[in-house]
Amino acid sequence: MAAAGGGGAAAGRTYSFKVVLLGEGCVGKTSLVLRYCENKFNDKHITTLQASFLTKKLNIGGKRVNLAIWDTAGQERFHALGPIYYRDSNGAILVYDITDEDSFQKVKNWVKELRKMLGNEICLCIVGNKVDLEKERHVSIQEAESYAESVGAKHYHTSAKQNKGIEELFLDLCKRMIETAQVDERAKGNGSSQPGAARRGVQIIDDEPQAQSVGGGCCSSG
């Protein structure tokens, strides 16, 4: 759900966005979130059970952004719970391990599911994680980037271990979500019917202080 806080020019608004991370177990989803929100990294593999979330506050070009980042379990037995966590999401980060071809193929299944449930309004990021293991790569960069382009997503390379590409990933996603929210707001102002915007709950609200970060379980290193 996205909410844009009123009270002045657009540049001074606060946007609240929900972002969900999806992907197989062991690809490093939780490591990415912990590195981004708390600048922490743990080599140990601790499995995420169902889902957890962290929050992050940013200021992008004078626009305040509150992110609620949902980290979901990658195990197959939790797959059916996916819709509970990604409904009303403004952005989705689909993570694969560059050393694991199967994890990349599973990303394609998530993309199909998200497009079916949420249409084209959700901003998609496809992320090749663990680039610190480049010598063990089994997913070609060209293949991954070509696929991302074909489904209207953007492709990124990250390493939670080396803290590479993570800030850029989230910053770019936030900018894209702001642009989408502004388009929805203009459409509402013009009296246009926007089913997608209504589904995601884009609305103008008064600014309210957001709660401090709430941490949950972990996933894999990388």
Swiss-Prot record:
Pfam families: Ras. The modification Cysteine methyl ester is found at C219. A motif (Switch 2) lies at residues 73-91. A motif (Switch 1) lies at residues 40-53. GTP binds at residues 25, 28-31, 42-43, 45, 47-48, 74, 129-130, 132, 160-161. The modification N-acetylalanine is found at A2. Its EC number is 3.6.5.2. The small GTPases Rab are key regulators of intracellular membrane trafficking, from the formation of transport vesicles to their fusion with membranes. Rabs cycle between an inactive GDP-bound form and an active GTP-bound form that is able to recruit to membranes different sets of downstream effectors directly responsible for vesicle formation, movement, tethering and fusion. RAB21 is involved in membrane trafficking control. Regulates integrin internalization and recycling, but does not influence the traffic of endosomally translocated receptors in general. NCBIfam families: small_GTP. Interacts with the cytoplasmic tail of integrins ITGA1, ITGA2, ITGA5, ITGA6, ITGA11 and ITGB1; this interaction is dependent upon its GDP/GTP cycle. Interacts with RABGEF1 (via VPS9 domain). Interacts with ANKRD27. Interacts (in GTP-bound form) with VAMP8 in response to starvation; the interaction probably regulates VAMP8 endolysosomal trafficking. Interacts (active GTP-bound form) with TMED10; the interaction is indirect and regulates TMED10 abundance and localization at the Golgi. Belongs to the small GTPase superfamily. Rab family. This is Ras-related protein Rab-21.
